[in-house]
Amino acid sequence: MCQAIITQLKPGGRLVALTINPHLVPDRLPRVEHYHSGVTLPGPLYDGAPVEVTMLTASGPLQIRDYYWSQATYESVLRQVGIESIMWHAMQVSAAGFETFGRAYWEAYLAHPHSIVLEAPRDAAAAGCAELLLGEDRP
């Protein structure tokens, strides 16, 4: 999948993905009911383990099956397709979120978030790698 994504990025473009936090602590996950979203782990964590993501909406719960991948796996796969600069960004609460609910409300989520943002810019070296792999020159 990373191969397909990276070939669509122009040099200087970047992959930004909201993904399951590879540093999940199963017994510290915030309650779905408290934040209106969360994850359920049906079993132990391992690369490829299914994870149920639940979002509580006005029309009822929305459930999505996702999969857990370790940070090492994400980074290894991205490096295989020529991405060298990989950044992880913790979830943040806006000033309005703090103002509306207070800091104490967000403490559990910020300490153990179920999601994280992965950012991987495509540089010129990655562009060359993709062209070699595809055997073509992409704009």
What are the roles of these predicted feature ranges?
Residues T54-T57, Q92-E107:
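Class I S-adenosyl-L-methionine
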Residues R65-W88:
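Short alpha-helix
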Residues H23-P26, A58-T73:
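Acceptor-substrate binding/catalytic loop of class I
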Residues P22-H23, M91-V93:
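Conserved beta-strand edge residues that scaffold enzyme active sites
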Residues M1, P26-R28, F98:
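Short glycine-/acidic-enriched loop or helix-start segments at secondary-structure transitions
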Residues R14-P50:
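Conserved class I S-adenosyl-L-methionine
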Residues V81-E84, G102-P139:
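Core SAM-dependent methyltransferase catalytic element
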